[in-house]
Amino acid sequence: MVAEISPLLKFVLELGPLMVFFFANSRGEWLASTFPVLTEFGGPIFIATGLFMIATATALTVSWILTRKLPIMPLISGIVVFVFGALTLWLQNDTFIKMKPTIVNTLFGVILLGGLFFGQSLLGYVFNSAFKLTDEGWRKLTLRWGVFFLFLAVLNEVVWRMFTTDTWVAFKVWGTMPITIIFTMAQMPFVMRHSVEPLGKDEK
């Protein structure tokens, strides 16, 4: 039987690689002296990038083993991590890993808003099994998330271009996740208002 991932484990699998990235960047010199093999990656940000790729692959593998499927968003994000992480290490240029959130969020935003342009509320295809909304509800929720992803893309560009690498790493871990959680919670009243009533409720 395929197991369902508990919300806590799902949160750990999503946040774990980011925590590894933050720790490896902040303690890069200690890691390099303790595990000399890591110096093959380069400086702290490159060590963090290498371990981030490994942690991401591990999280995706655990998710697959437990559920025999991979959620589309973590999968796409993981692919971009591997591509841009590899470029970062190969060229020894941290610009690529810094642009990864911009690319991922822009991709999600364009896909969602592009779907609306063609009359498709793509968010509904992803979450329809979790909760049911009216067509109008899916359209508006898709629009909100599409705009939010583009906002995150712009915000990432501002932070990595205007601040230090350490500040960007801290923001990536301690800024982006809380902002996303707050935004998600803020959508709950909207989701409740546009939820489809269970069939048969009005027939009693």
Swiss-Prot record:
Keywords tagged on the record: Cell inner membrane, Cell membrane, Membrane, Transmembrane, Transmembrane helix
PANTHER family: INNER MEMBRANE-SPANNING PROTEIN YCIB, INTRACELLULAR SEPTATION PROTEIN A-RELATED
Family, per entry: Belongs to the YciB family.
Entry protein name: Inner membrane-spanning protein YciB
An annotated GO cellular component: plasma membrane
Family annotation (NCBIfam families): ispZ, PRK00259.1-1
Superkingdom of origin organism: Bacteria
Membrane topology summary: Multi-pass membrane protein
Role: Plays a role in cell envelope biogenesis, maintenance of cell envelope integrity and membrane homeostasis.
Stored Pfam families: IspA
Subcellular location: Cell inner membrane
